[in-house]
């Protein structure tokens, strides 16, 4: 489905981390389809190369960089190379991240530190390098960082919750501090999306049960995340900075007992409590 004009991002240079799978791949493909040159990066070279091949097959322009966002020298080399080849960077999408589910009491110092380094330190290093090497000198640039939508706590994910909250506040703070350089920064709090990870890592029943906890009663499509990022990257997003946009089918607004709003029974009618009729 084509939402935007085909040349919306014509000539823009966009760096997308975690571009090898899921939301990152969908974002890279969408930005390239709108005319941007996409530099996709990630730790595993094969998935990144596959994304680049997909883009090139449909006539887009893309490059792949295998690197770890936690490695500050690799981050510097990434942006130095992009600027040497293209002269500038217009958009950075911080999509790379990761976590594992575990009871809080079972998380080791190493496990907690790893999640913080990947999600917070890595995001900071990518953002700082993009800003100091490109955005601040050219007095223009945009950063979109992908986080998670459960803002009221998610059991088993204390390390990830702490990390994602840090990234959101990082974007808010930098949006004020770097406004004088015309650098705009936003975060997108992502809910549950129908990516290859959820399709291949878990039984189908898991995704179905997850969808039932979403008021809109479905998982998001990766393209729906990509469309929002494309909007922010476009001139339409020029006055958006310092905000956290939640894309999760209203899941973050619901925290009450089962069933969630929107759930229906076999008849298709909304579920409701059977109440005793008053005596006649």
Regions found by a protein language model. Give the residues of each.
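Conserved glycine-rich cofactor-binding loop
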Residues: 13, 20-22
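Conserved glycine-rich Rossmann-like NAD(P)H-binding loop of the short-chain dehydrogenase/reductase
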Residues: 36-50
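C-terminal helical subdomain
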Residues: 169, 180, 187, 208-240, ...
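Catalytic loop of short-chain dehydrogenase/reductase
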Residues: 144-167, 171-180, 192
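Short C-terminal tail/terminal secondary-structure segment
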Residues: 1-4, 241-280
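Alpha-helical segment proximal to the catalytic Tyr-Lys
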Residues: 132-136, 176-180, 238
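Substrate-binding pocket helix/loop in short-chain dehydrogenase/reductase
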Residues: 103-104, 108-116, 210
């Amino acid at each position: 489905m084509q939402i935007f004009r085909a040349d919306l991002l014509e000539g823009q240079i966009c760096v997308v981390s975690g571009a090898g799978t899921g939301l990152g791949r969908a974002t890279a493909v969408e930005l390239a389809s709108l005319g941007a040159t996409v530099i996709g990066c990630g730790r595993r070279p094969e998935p990144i190369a596959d994304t680049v091949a997909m883009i090139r097959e449909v006539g887009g322009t893309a490059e792949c960089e295998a690197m770890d966002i936690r490695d500050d020298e690799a981050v510097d080399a990434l942006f130095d190379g992009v600027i040497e080849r293209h002269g500038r960077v217009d958009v950075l999408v911080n999509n790379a991240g990761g976590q594992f589910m575990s009871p809080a009491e079972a998380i080791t110092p190493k496990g907690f530190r790893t999640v913080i380094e990947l999600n917070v330190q890595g995001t900071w290093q990518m953002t700082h390098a993009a800003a100091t090497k490109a955005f601040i000198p050219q007095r223009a640039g945009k950063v979109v960082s992908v986080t998670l939508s459960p803002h009221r706590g998610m059991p088993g994910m204390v390390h990830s919750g702490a990390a994602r909250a840090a990234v959101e506040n990082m974007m808010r703070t930098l949006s004020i501090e770097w406004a004088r350089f015309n650098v705009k920064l936003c975060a997108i709090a992502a809910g549950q999306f129908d990516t290859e990870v959820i399709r291949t890592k878990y039984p189908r029943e898991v995704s179905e049960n997850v969808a039932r906890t979403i008021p809109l009663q479905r998982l998001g499509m990766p393209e729906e995340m990509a469309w929002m990022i494309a909007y922010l990257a476009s001139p339409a997003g020029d006055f958006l900075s310092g905000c956290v946009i939640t894309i999760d089918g209203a899941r973050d607004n619901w925290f009450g007992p089962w069933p969630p709003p929107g759930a229906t029974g076999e008849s298709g009618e909304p579920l409701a409590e059977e109440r005793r009729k008053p005596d006649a």
